[in-house]
UniProtKB/Swiss-Prot annotation:
UniProt xrefs under SUPFAM superfamilies: KA1-like, Protein kinase-like (PK-like)
GO biological process: intracellular signal transduction
Similarity annotation: Belongs to the protein kinase superfamily. CAMK Ser/Thr protein kinase family. SNF1 subfamily.
Start and end residues of each KA1 domain: 453-501
Entry protein name: Carbon catabolite-derepressing protein kinase
Residues annotated as domain UBA: 290-330
Gene of this entry: RKIN1
Length: 502
């Protein structure tokens, strides 16, 4: 391969083959692992060409996300075996998918029949759901980022625009391809994350069934207008069930948009659902600790020390032993159909209570040993209280309580998100106005007179956010940023008392 010599030291465990594709800052080459003789794809990112800070940040973010999945097994997320970073390049060694991407497949087939589209869509939703469960939102879902293996199973790839979700915080960056981007993304609004992936999945489902995207226009302002207005046409040949599902995924208001959990329960999705997709994947930490004995024996046969392999796997290390182990493990499952050899799951409406849904058996993480369980619907309401009062009236009461407790605050964007600071024993400020910021940007509210004994031992910084729920109520949430946990709980109790909740 051209340029193979310059990578020889970093990729000494691989025979390098031909170039599969070339991008602006990266190229993908096919390679063979020397010890296991299994094929891999290696993405080579040239760090010298990524001079723009945002491109370097994109690469770092992708590496961070990929390393989250490096020892996790999901049948429809591209497998990453190792990430090698050198001063000049970043090498991402990953699963090789020989049938290209979903876009080329759609263009070749023009459009898919409903059964084939459903099979593909079920796999996509399973992968996206797994990302969300591990606090990763993809943000760039499109057919080009969905690869196909030798049996045309979907593999979710390219996490370069992904981000890690944090409780109580929104994302704002406008990411992804315009045709697949949600209205709130192109409008520059705040979003939590999962809801924009749901929109993109709706566009992908439309493309699978229709051979075109629902929102398209050569004129960018017109395209934005169509997306923001949710203006599209559903062909008459689509069944009523899939028309219903698409229309619920492409709702402009993210609060009313269907969720991944609701998609899973939809009748169209449930039809001919493979059993391995009806089974929730193993917990991340439990899965990382599981060792396949047959694969372990094969790794030892290659000359690796058994104890060192086990120790590396348990500690989630990246080294020659773990790379060989996961390559052998994945190819074992492909050879035996592994996950993908399961039978169909009965639709929920026709299934008996004992077969409605499953959890992995305690001795089998791949779903062959299943035990039935009853899914109990639970509604969680995080935050202090729900109210139907106008949001402005709620915030006035909140500010009154903050004033009573002598909390410093400032608006964080709009008036429904406040950054706050509370110092126990801080002298009362009598001229605080309810409709203005009690700013602490320049720390003028707290003066240091040089006396160490006068400095307060603890300061609580927290955020207050008012949310609107699906049933048109308003939910007040508080999140500690810094400061002692118990002291924050004491403050919350005092705050609730002032709000007359307790």
């Amino acid at each position: 391969m051209d340029g193979g010599g310059e990578h020889s030291e970093a990729l000494k465990n691989y025979y390098l083959g031909k170039i599969l594709g070339v991008g602006t800052f990266a190229k993908v080459i096919i390679a063979e692992h020397k010890h296991t003789r299994h094929k891999v794809a290696i993405k080579v990112l040239n760090r010298r060409q990524m001079r723009a800070p945002e491109m370097e940040e994109k690469a770092k973010r992708e590496i961070k996300i990929l390393r989250l999945f490096i020892d996790l097994i999901h049948p429809h997320i591209i497998r990453v075996y190792e990430v090698i970073v050198t001063p000049k390049d970043i090498f991402v060694v990953m699963e090789y998918c020989q049938n290209g991407d979903l876009l080329d497949y759609i263009l070749e087939k023009r459009r898919l029949q409903e059964d084939e589209a459903r099979r593909t869509f079920q796999q996509i939703i399973s992968a996206v759901e797994y990302c969300h469960r591990n606090k990763v939102v993809h943000r760039d879902l499109k057919p080009e980022n969905l690869l196909l293996d030798s049996k045309y199973n979907v593999k979710l790839a390219d996490f370069g625009l992904s981000n890690v979700m944090h409780d109580g915080h929104f994302l704002k960056t406008s990411c992804g391809s315009l045709n697949y981007a949600a209205p709130e993304v192109i409008s520059g609004k705040l979003y939590a994350g999962p809801e924009i992936d749901v929109w993109s999945c709706g566009v992908i489902l439309y493309a699978l069934l229709c051979g075109a995207v629902p929102f398209d226009d050569d004129n960018i302002p017109n395209l934005f207008k169509k997306i923001k207005g949710g203006t599209y046409i559903l062909p008459i040949y689509l069944s009523d069930l899939v028309r219903d599902l698409i229309s619920r995924m492409l709702i402009v208001d993210p609060m009313k948009r269907i969720t991944i959990g609701e998609i899973r329960k939809h009748s169209w999705f449930q039809n001919r659902l493979p059993r391995y997709l009806a089974v929730p994947p193993p917990d991340m930490m439990q899965q990382a600790k599981m060792i396949d004995e047959d694969t372990l024996r094969d790794v030892v046969k290659l000359g690796y020390d058994k104890d060192h392999v086990c120790e590396s796997l348990c500690n989630r290390l990246q080294n020659e032993e773990t790379v060989a182990y996961y390559l052998l493990l994945d190819n074992r499952f492909r050879a035996t159909s592994g996950y993908l050899g399961a039978h169909y799951q009965q639709p929920m409406e026709s299934a008996s209570p004992s077969t409605r849904s499953y959890l992995p058996g305690s001795n089998d993480s791949q779903g062959s040993g299943l035990r039935p369980y009853y899914r109990v619907e639970r509604k969680w309401a995080l935050g202090l209280q729900q109210s139907r009062a106008p949001p402005r009236a709620i915030m006035i009461e909140v500010l009154k309580a903050l004033k009573e407790l002598n909390v410093c605050w400032k608006k964080n964007g709009d008036c429904y998100n406040m950054k706050c600071r509370w110092c126990p024993g801080f002298p009362r400020v009598s001229d605080m106005l309810l409709d203005a910021n009690h700013s602490f940007v320049d720390d003028c509210a707290i003066k240091d007179n040089g006396d160490a004994n006068s400095r307060l031992p603890a300061v609580i910084k927290f955020e207050i956010q008012l949310y609107k729920t699906k049933d048109d109520k308003y939910l007040l949430d508080m999140q500690r940023v810094t400061g002692p946990q118990l002291l924050f709980l004491e403050f919350c109790a005092a705050f609730l008392t002032n709000l007359r909740v307790l």
